[in-house]
Amino acid sequence: MSRRNAAVKRPILPDPQFNSRLASMMVARLMKHGKKSTAQRILSDAFGLIGERTGADPLEVFETAVRNSTPLVEVRARRVGGATYQVPMEVRQERGTAMALRWLVNFSRSRGGRSMAQKLAGELMDAANEAGSAVRKREETHKMAEANKAFAHYRY
């Protein structure tokens, strides 16, 4: 175990364009090779497309999508006497949000063709409507936790 002090958690500053912490977290997940302005442009274009297609506030659609994709429980591998059990554990809020954002970005990238902004907008709108791959991943995670409820007493 490390003898160092725990790293100080940096505060997440809100995104300058949308004034939202969640948006700045999404920009960080979208960013590749330090190209922050490109990631911001992708998010901005995606929000523009969401606004056009739904007529609703894109930031609200985005927040709903993240909320619908955030897992509440997950399974973690725990080794007990030679056997590895999938132990269901609650997910802390920060980790849940981070997982949701990661899933939204990854599933957006795996969507077919078109620009990243269009793919992201599509995934966000699907997630806001309780559809899409990120929401399906959340449901799978919850089902796994439910199936392994018998091992909940191995929690650490």
Curated annotation (Swiss-Prot):
One GO term (biological process): translation
Family matches, as CDD domains: uS7_Chloroplast
Gene3D superfamilies to which the protein is assigned, alphabetical: Ribosomal protein S7 domain (1.10.455.10)
Source domain of life: Bacteria
Keywords: Ribonucleoprotein, Ribosomal protein, RNA-binding, rRNA-binding, tRNA-binding
Signal peptide positions on this chain: none
One MF term in the entry's GO annotations: tRNA binding
Cysteines paired by S-S bonds: none
GO cellular component labels: small ribosomal subunit
One protein family per Pfam: Ribosomal_S7
InterPro entries xrefs: Ribosomal_uS7, Ribosomal_uS7_bac/org-type, Ribosomal_uS7_CS, Ribosomal_uS7_dom, Ribosomal_uS7_dom_sf
NCBIfam families for the chain: rpsG_bact
Function according to Swiss-Prot or TrEMBL: One of the primary rRNA binding proteins, it binds directly to 16S rRNA where it nucleates assembly of the head domain of the 30S subunit. Is located at the subunit interface close to the decoding center, probably blocks exit of the E-site tRNA.
Family of the protein in this entry: Belongs to the universal ribosomal protein uS7 family.
Record note on quaternary structure: Part of the 30S ribosomal subunit. Contacts proteins S9 and S11.
Name of protein: Small ribosomal subunit protein uS7
Species of provenance: Synechococcus sp. (strain RCC307)
Name of the encoding gene: rpsG
